[in-house]
Protein backbone atom coordinates (compact mmCIF):
# COMPACT_ATOMS: atom_id res chain seq x y z
CA UNK A 1 0.00 0.00 0.00
CA UNK A 2 1.40 3.37 -0.99
CA UNK A 3 1.16 6.18 1.54
CA UNK A 4 2.45 9.67 2.20
CA UNK A 5 3.72 10.69 5.63
CA UNK A 6 4.20 14.33 6.62
CA UNK A 7 6.38 14.79 9.71
CA UNK A 8 5.49 18.05 11.44
CA UNK A 9 8.47 18.60 13.79
CA UNK A 10 6.95 21.21 16.10
CA UNK A 11 5.53 21.01 19.61
CA UNK A 12 4.32 23.55 22.15
CA UNK A 13 6.51 21.96 24.81
CA UNK A 14 8.67 18.90 25.39
CA UNK A 15 6.88 15.88 26.85
CA UNK A 16 9.18 13.96 29.19
CA UNK A 17 8.69 10.60 27.46
CA UNK A 18 9.35 11.78 23.88
CA UNK A 19 12.55 10.99 22.00
CA UNK A 20 11.45 12.34 18.61
CA UNK A 21 13.14 15.27 16.92
CA UNK A 22 11.08 18.44 17.30
CA UNK A 23 11.31 22.15 18.01
CA UNK A 24 9.22 24.27 20.35
CA UNK A 25 9.77 27.25 18.06
CA UNK A 26 7.50 27.79 15.07
CA UNK A 27 9.88 30.25 13.39
CA UNK A 28 10.85 27.66 10.76
CA UNK A 29 7.32 26.42 10.10
CA UNK A 30 6.86 28.16 6.74
CA UNK A 31 10.22 27.03 5.30
CA UNK A 32 9.50 23.45 6.39
CA UNK A 33 6.03 23.53 4.84
CA UNK A 34 7.58 24.86 1.62
CA UNK A 35 10.16 22.05 1.74
CA UNK A 36 7.35 19.49 2.12
CA UNK A 37 5.54 20.91 -0.92
CA UNK A 38 8.79 20.83 -2.91
CA UNK A 39 9.52 17.27 -1.79
CA UNK A 40 6.14 16.11 -3.12
CA UNK A 41 7.02 17.44 -6.57
CA UNK A 42 10.50 15.91 -6.48
CA UNK A 43 9.26 12.47 -5.39
CA UNK A 44 6.46 12.26 -7.94
CA UNK A 45 8.46 10.16 -10.40
CA UNK A 46 9.57 7.65 -7.75
CA UNK A 47 6.21 5.94 -7.34
CA UNK A 48 5.95 3.10 -9.86
CA UNK A 49 3.08 2.85 -12.34
CA UNK A 50 1.14 5.74 -10.88
CA UNK A 51 0.36 3.55 -7.86
CA UNK A 52 -2.65 4.67 -5.84
CA UNK A 53 -2.01 6.43 -2.53
CA UNK A 54 -4.31 4.92 0.09
CA UNK A 55 -3.19 6.94 3.11
CA UNK A 56 -1.90 10.40 3.97
CA UNK A 57 -0.67 10.72 7.54
CA UNK A 58 0.29 13.89 9.41
CA UNK A 59 2.52 12.86 12.32
CA UNK A 60 4.85 14.62 14.63
CA UNK A 61 5.69 16.44 16.59
CA UNK A 62 2.31 18.04 16.76
CA UNK A 63 0.54 18.37 13.40
CA UNK A 64 -2.42 20.05 15.11
CA UNK A 65 -0.24 23.16 15.33
CA UNK A 66 -0.89 23.54 11.59
CA UNK A 67 -3.87 25.57 10.43
CA UNK A 68 -6.55 23.85 8.35
CA UNK A 69 -5.37 25.93 5.37
CA UNK A 70 -1.82 24.59 5.77
CA UNK A 71 -3.12 21.02 6.01
CA UNK A 72 -5.27 21.61 2.92
CA UNK A 73 -2.26 22.94 0.99
CA UNK A 74 -0.31 19.75 1.66
CA UNK A 75 -3.27 17.50 0.83
CA UNK A 76 -3.95 19.38 -2.40
CA UNK A 77 -0.30 19.23 -3.46
CA UNK A 78 -0.26 15.49 -2.76
CA UNK A 79 -3.34 15.10 -4.96
CA UNK A 80 -1.74 17.19 -7.74
CA UNK A 81 1.39 15.07 -7.78
CA UNK A 82 0.13 11.59 -6.94
CA UNK A 83 -2.81 9.33 -7.63
CA UNK A 84 -4.55 9.74 -4.26
CA UNK A 85 -7.49 7.36 -3.86
CA UNK A 86 -10.88 9.04 -3.54
CA UNK A 87 -11.40 7.08 -0.32
CA UNK A 88 -7.87 7.59 1.05
CA UNK A 89 -7.56 7.68 4.80
CA UNK A 90 -6.21 11.10 5.76
CA UNK A 91 -5.08 11.15 9.39
CA UNK A 92 -3.86 14.01 11.55
CA UNK A 93 -2.31 13.52 14.98
CA UNK A 94 -3.68 15.99 17.49
CA UNK A 95 -3.25 16.95 21.12
CA UNK A 96 -6.42 17.63 23.15
CA UNK A 97 -5.29 21.16 24.05
CA UNK A 98 -5.07 22.10 20.38
CA UNK A 99 -8.84 21.90 19.92
CA UNK A 100 -10.23 25.36 19.28
CA UNK A 101 -13.51 26.73 17.90
CA UNK A 102 -14.31 25.17 14.51
CA UNK A 103 -10.89 23.45 14.23
CA UNK A 104 -12.24 19.90 14.00
CA UNK A 105 -14.92 20.96 11.55
CA UNK A 106 -12.40 22.83 9.38
CA UNK A 107 -10.02 19.85 9.34
CA UNK A 108 -12.86 17.64 8.17
CA UNK A 109 -13.82 20.18 5.49
CA UNK A 110 -10.28 20.16 4.04
CA UNK A 111 -10.21 16.37 3.79
CA UNK A 112 -9.00 14.98 7.13
CA UNK A 113 -11.19 11.94 7.79
CA UNK A 114 -9.37 10.38 10.75
CA UNK A 115 -7.87 11.86 13.90
CA UNK A 116 -5.30 10.30 16.21
CA UNK A 117 -5.54 11.95 19.62
CA UNK A 118 -2.48 11.98 21.89
CA UNK A 119 -4.27 11.69 25.21
CA UNK A 120 -1.62 9.47 26.91
CA UNK A 121 -3.61 9.39 30.20
CA UNK A 122 -6.86 10.57 31.76
CA UNK A 123 -5.17 11.05 35.17
CA UNK A 124 -3.94 14.51 36.16
CA UNK A 125 -0.95 13.13 38.09
CA UNK A 126 0.27 11.16 35.09
CA UNK A 127 -0.28 14.07 32.69
CA UNK A 128 1.81 16.32 34.95
CA UNK A 129 4.52 13.66 35.25
CA UNK A 130 4.72 13.50 31.43
CA UNK A 131 4.67 17.32 31.11
CA UNK A 132 1.59 17.21 28.89
CA UNK A 133 -0.01 20.55 27.98
CA UNK A 134 -3.59 19.31 28.37
CA UNK A 135 -5.58 18.23 31.40
CA UNK A 136 -7.94 15.30 31.79
CA UNK A 137 -11.06 17.38 31.17
CA UNK A 138 -9.69 18.64 27.85
CA UNK A 139 -9.12 15.01 26.85
CA UNK A 140 -12.72 14.09 27.63
CA UNK A 141 -14.02 17.23 25.91
CA UNK A 142 -12.17 16.63 22.63
CA UNK A 143 -13.32 13.00 22.56
CA UNK A 144 -16.93 14.14 22.97
CA UNK A 145 -16.55 16.56 20.05
CA UNK A 146 -14.79 14.06 17.80
CA UNK A 147 -17.45 11.40 18.26
CA UNK A 148 -20.03 13.72 16.78
CA UNK A 149 -17.89 14.59 13.74
CA UNK A 150 -15.59 11.70 12.84
CA UNK A 151 -16.45 8.06 12.21
CA UNK A 152 -12.81 7.07 12.45
CA UNK A 153 -10.39 8.09 15.20
CA UNK A 154 -7.84 6.61 17.55
CA UNK A 155 -6.28 7.67 20.81
CA UNK A 156 -2.91 7.04 22.40
CA UNK A 157 -2.56 5.88 26.00
CA UNK A 158 0.78 5.15 27.68
CA UNK A 159 1.10 2.03 29.81
CA UNK A 160 3.74 1.49 32.49
CA UNK A 161 4.38 5.01 33.71
CA UNK A 162 6.27 5.34 37.01
CA UNK A 163 3.93 4.96 40.01
CA UNK A 164 1.07 3.85 37.78
CA UNK A 165 -1.15 1.09 39.07
CA UNK A 166 -3.25 -1.55 37.33
CA UNK A 167 -6.30 0.36 38.59
CA UNK A 168 -5.12 3.57 36.87
CA UNK A 169 -4.61 1.68 33.64
CA UNK A 170 -8.05 0.06 33.89
CA UNK A 171 -9.67 3.48 34.39
CA UNK A 172 -7.76 4.87 31.40
CA UNK A 173 -9.00 2.08 29.18
CA UNK A 174 -12.59 2.42 30.39
Regions found by a protein language model. Give the residues of each.
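Local cysteine-cluster metal-coordination motifs and their immediate loop/turn environment
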Residues: 9-20
Amino acid sequence: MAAIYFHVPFCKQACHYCNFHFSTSLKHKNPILYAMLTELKLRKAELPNNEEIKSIYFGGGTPSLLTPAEVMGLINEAKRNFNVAADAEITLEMNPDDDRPNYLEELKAVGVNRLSIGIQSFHEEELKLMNRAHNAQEAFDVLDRIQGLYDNFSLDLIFGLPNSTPEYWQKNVE
